[in-house]
């Protein structure tokens, strides 16, 4: 049985499945012919394997996907060790990318994301009562990338999380933001950064 891919590794929002492949960027840069190819490589090499792994750990369960038997290839954790400049999956895109992940039963694990140990994760708590793990501070202060922005604040008295992908192009200073799902009932958020040095 093949590993469940993007159609099955979906997010739950307001009781319905939201296919991961439905992600859209609100602002698209003009004059970039390789944008589509870059996005496709990013999804195939980074997000789809990560979502499949989270699904195997029962952290994300869609109503239909939760009933599927998981093949052995979906039970493998990410490779040990942090990513370094020049890693294959870092070469697949040129812009800084930031990803936020939410889970109802998140427990910090040393192998949750590739760069966790190297970037010095710290468990903090904001004014809204959310537990937040972030690894972004050292990255954006050193590399001048996208500043850390927590999406787990209280809004109108209700807890609200957004699962998102943010991109930022250093050479033009453009920032695009894409919201994939909003789930009010989730209680914890995991924020991670995947990055490479940019050529301007």
UniProtKB/Swiss-Prot annotation:
Acidic residues bias locations: 25-39
Lineage: Eukaryota, Metazoa, Chordata, Craniata, Vertebrata
Compartments where located: Cytoplasm
Region (Disordered): 19-39
Protein name per UniProt: Putative protein ATXN8OS
GO cellular component, one term: cytoplasm
Main location: cytoplasm
Top-rank taxon: Eukaryota
Tissues expressing the protein: Expressed in brain. Expressed in muscle tissues (at protein level).
């Amino acid at each position: 049985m093949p590993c469940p891919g993007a159609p099955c590794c979906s997010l739950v929002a307001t009781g319905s499945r939201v296919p991961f492949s439905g992600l859209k960027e609100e602002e698209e840069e003009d004059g970039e012919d390789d944008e589509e190819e870059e996005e496709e490589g990013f999804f195939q090499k980074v997000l789809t394997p990560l979502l499949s792994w989270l699904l195997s750990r029962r952290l994300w369960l869609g109503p239909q996907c939760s009933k599927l038997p998981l093949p052995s290839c979906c039970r493998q954790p990410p490779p040990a060790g942090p990513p370094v400049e020049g890693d294959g999956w870092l070469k697949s895109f040129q812009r800084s990318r930031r990803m936020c992940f939410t889970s109802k039963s998140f427990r910090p694990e040393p192998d949750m994301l590739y760069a966790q140990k190297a970037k010095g994760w710290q468990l903090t708590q904001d004014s809204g009562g959310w537990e937040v793990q972030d690894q972004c501070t050292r990255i954006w202060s050193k590399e001048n990338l996208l500043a850390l922005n927590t999406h787990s604040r209280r809004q109108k008295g209700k807890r609200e999380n957004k699962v998102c992908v943010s991109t930022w192009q250093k050479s033009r200073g453009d920032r695009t933001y894409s919201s994939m799902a909003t789930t009010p009932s989730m209680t914890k958020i995991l924020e991670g950064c995947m990055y490479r040095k940019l050529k301007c």
